[in-house]
Structures are given as structure tokens and as C-alpha cells.
Amino acid sequence: MFDSTLNPLWQRYILAVQEEVKPALGCTEPISLALAAAVAAAELEGPVERVEAWVSPNLMKNGLGVTVPGTGMVGLPIAAALGALGGNANAGLEVLKDATAQAIADAKALLAAGKVSVKIQEPCNEILFSRAKVWNGEKWACVTIVGGHTNIVHIETHNGVVFTQQACVAEGEQESPLTVLSRTTLAEILKFVNEVPFAAIRFILDSAKLNCALSQEGLSGKWGLHIGATLEKQCERGLLAKDLSSSIVIRTSAASDARMGGATLPAMSNSGSGNQGITATMPVVVVAEHFGADDERLARALMLSHLSAIYIHNQLPRLSALCAATTAAMGAAAGMAWLVDGRYETISMAISSMIGDVSGMICDGASNSCAMKVSTSASAAWKAVLMALDDTAVTGNEGIVAHDVEQSIANLCALASHSMQQTDRQIIEIMASKAR
């Protein structure tokens, strides 16, 4: 429940964060399909004997090369199979949290028997689309998710339609928090962060708790490309400085290593992505620890980071050719700048420099290499903050950066939303040719 004395706009900000910053176990694209399969299995009369699935090209792109937690296997077929046989239909993005060793073995057996198929939905106008149909003999159940990783729009069985999401909005219904957020500004977000009661945003500290645990697991060196663990070793060997900049990169990339390598620990996601949640969280946590910030100061910095990341990503397609670790790191830059300096000018300069630095990074699907992009984005964020502290930034005379940070963000998002659509198609074509 909200404090009734809170500014209504602030209430919408908090709702936006609560909707977009959630625990997620495993990369969220295959997990979206696993959820569809789990919900379908819950509707099926009898045990699952066969699974069919269809996904959008973008979801296929992000599901081809990522490890599904607990399985040691990559790809959408194992996600669909495990969701159907061991998923918790009520757990959202943590659908696989209760999967047992037996369920994993059964899912692998179903896969080996050729009873699982995943195809691209054609035609498909949706960026994020997953549909799972599970069978028991002639009986079946089918679930469709569209637009958001957990947004179930249709449930149907051989007996008929169970549920269909109504597209219309009831008269007098409040606008969604993201719609409200689309009309705000970074200056208004900063005012909120500075003035909102700590008790109203204390919950954001959970992002530090979850993502720090994931980072610690990643430092074991067992996961993914073990970038964080490797860089930590290089510090011990004297090849990399043991300083704040290194700590930011090491601890952030370690969390992504564990995330993408299939560790069975949840990440606190942002905008439907664990890596975005990690990127918006870990750099801020490391800087807060460096300065000895208390819980309230950390919570305000994390709220600024996560809300800024959501604000920017809300102007993008849910999935695109632009690596969204870059936009999440713009949020992190804001949070770190606030911890060190607190001024709007420093925050806006840091974000502008980020846009002038890493905005061209492509998303070529979810995989272990995402941790490389996460580490690059985290490093760029801290560099941008250091520049801003010295009153230096990429200016409006250069490239897509404008004189106003809001216009710079709009320019970046226009590039991703329009011109990079062809880039996205080319990436998907290249990846599909590799999978043949």
C-alpha cells in the first residue's frame, strides 16, 4: 500500500519500478517461453507428452545461445520442455525456481525423443511473442504471451477458450505507470529521488541483495566466460589495477557471467532483462560501498539508476538491435554521479557522454558474451561520470548527442526504433544461417 500523502506522480514512479524491476531466474526470453509452457501444462488434462512452440524472430535471437538454469543446456527447446515438465505456472519470471533434478532429466529425455519443437512464428508483427502448445494424446492446451515477458494474452485448450486478454481500457481507468513515465523528465525523476520518503523506496535495496549474490557466484569462475573472475586474477597478477574502476567492472561482469552461464540464482531484472538489472545495480552498489553510503543513500542512488534506465528503455522497442545494457548503464551513470556529486548537471553530462560512447553496440542475441557488453557498458558509465565531475562531456556539436540530454535520449531511441530495424533483421538472418 502507498502512503496516501505521496505525490500521485511519485506513486506512478514507484509502480513503474515495481512493475519493471523484478526477480528473474534465467535469461528472460527463454524464460518467457518456459512460462507459457508451464501455464499450458497446468491447463492440460494429464501429463505432457509433447511440446510445440512458436516465437518471434527477436525472441528466437535471444534464446539461441543462452544457458537455461540447472540444465547445462542452451536454447529454447530445453526451456520449453522444462517449463512444461517442471515449471511453476504461478512464479512469473522465476518459473523454473522449483524445477527438480527429475524434472530436468525428464525434460532432457523429452527433447532426446524428438517430442519438442520450437519454430519462428510466421508472419509475426510482435517484437516479443511466445506460444507453447502441450499435448497429452489428442488433448492439448495452448498459451500465448505477447508484448511483455509475462503478459499472457490467450489461453485455450481442446475444450475451448479459457482466457483472452481484453484490449480495451475501461473508461476512467488510470494510465499505466510507463505511460505516465513517458511524459516525465530526468529532472523530475531526480526531484523524486531527492525528496521521496526513504520508506517508500526501501524495497529497491532488494536489487542490491539479489545481484550482489549473483556477482559473488560469478566470481567463483565457474560460469560463462568468467570475465569477472579473470579480471580479478589479473589484478592479483599486477596486470590490472586494484581500484574502484576495476571493482565496478569486475563485480558487474561477474554477475552477468553467472546469469548467462546458467547459475540457479535469480537476478533482479530491469525492463524484462536480468542483464539490464545487473547493469543498473552493481556499478551503483560498488561506488556506494566505496564511499560508505548508508542504506538510505544507496536506495536513492539505486532508485535513480533503475528509474532512469526504465525511462530511457521505455522509449525503445522491448527487444531491438541496440544492446540495452548500454541504456541500463546510462541509469547506472546517473546513480553513480548522484552518489559522488548529486547535481543534475553532472548526471545529464554523464548520460550524454554515454550516448556519445557506446550507443552503437548491437544486440546479437543473449549468450555468455553479454557479460562482455555489460562490462564495457559499466566501464563506460564510470568513465562518463569521471568526465562529468571534471565538467567535461560529449557536446551537442558531436554526432547524435544534442545540447539537451532529453533530446540526446530521444535521438538514440529514434535510431534504435527506426534505422536499426534493418540491422536487427540482418543479425537474425546471420544467426539463423548459423543454426541451420
Curated annotation (Swiss-Prot):
One of its GO terms (biological process) is L-cysteine catabolic process to pyruvate. GO terms for molecular function: L-cysteine desulfhydrase activity. The gene is yhaM. This is UPF0597 protein YhaM. It comes from Escherichia coli O139:H28 (strain E24377A / ETEC). Pfam families: SDH_alpha (PF03313). Belongs to the UPF0597 family.
